[in-house]
């Protein structure tokens, strides 16, 4: 897989996760986060097991235990995300979730891995764009939902870094399948403690079942498997840079499907400017022109040539 192909795959994941806020909003507010995780991850595992049945015999040993580690991190991420999204607007949730672009470089610095010059240039543009697209205002009260989303964001940053190490040495497909299995098992055990009747305690509606299936297929089965493959050919910061375009995708979806997002979601000039800044930042951080000595030399020589022509 080339770098361009990897970026396309990662952007498709961003599209899935951005649209997932729409379907999470359609779930009952009182639906337990553990029930949500059990059903979406369990259904995702069933889908993957059917499609890749022949590969299941290789799901053992180190791959199985590494997928369990990933599952534990994902469980924390999904629980906090579910608690956060149910309490704050979709645009705010998308903004806070995109702050992974800040936490990943910080954690990498702790691991003595420095971001590139392009990363340093692009991240401020992305952060400025995130503030404008989210509509977050200075002095606004800090809601509990925001704190939940920050916690989810931190665990997502840890997940991206850990996946980067695991996928370089193990089969991404098996890691993804094992992760879905472990998440479903862990979530079900926690749900069993919270509500012994589990599935029998729920009130099922067509809207809820449709949302669960779409979340399981796109935001779980597809997104996590493709994330595994994408990270095999990309570094953690590149992954989070592409993921930071999520608010732009969410904003576009809000324009296309306004009734689903509600009347509070509106398009403004500030959001347009914010979206442009995010795209500029993503392009800067996702390329390497500042570290490309040949390109910089050509630009310098080109500039000197133009000055020489003007002087003559």
Labelled PLM ranges:
Residues 16, 28-76, 103-107, 125, ...:
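Transmembrane alpha-helices of multi-pass small-molecule transport proteins
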Residues 8, 39-42, 208, 244-312:
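C-terminal-most transmembrane helix of multi-pass membrane proteins
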Residues 47-56, 100-121, 248-272:
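C-terminal transmembrane-helix exit sites in multi-pass transporters
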Residues 1-35, 72, 80, 139-165, ...:
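Glycine-/small-residue-enriched transmembrane alpha-helix faces in small-molecule transporters
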Residues 15-44, 83, 89-92, 158-183, ...:
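Juxtamembrane helix-loop-helix junctions in multi-pass membrane proteins
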Residues 20-21, 52-97, 130-133, 216-234:
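Specific transmembrane alpha-helical segments of multi-pass solute transporters/efflux pumps
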Residues 36-39, 79, 93-99, 163-185, ...:
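Helix-helix packing/entry segments at the starts of transmembrane helices
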Residues 48, 115-135, 187, 255, ...:
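Hydrophobic transmembrane alpha-helices of multi-pass small-molecule transport proteins
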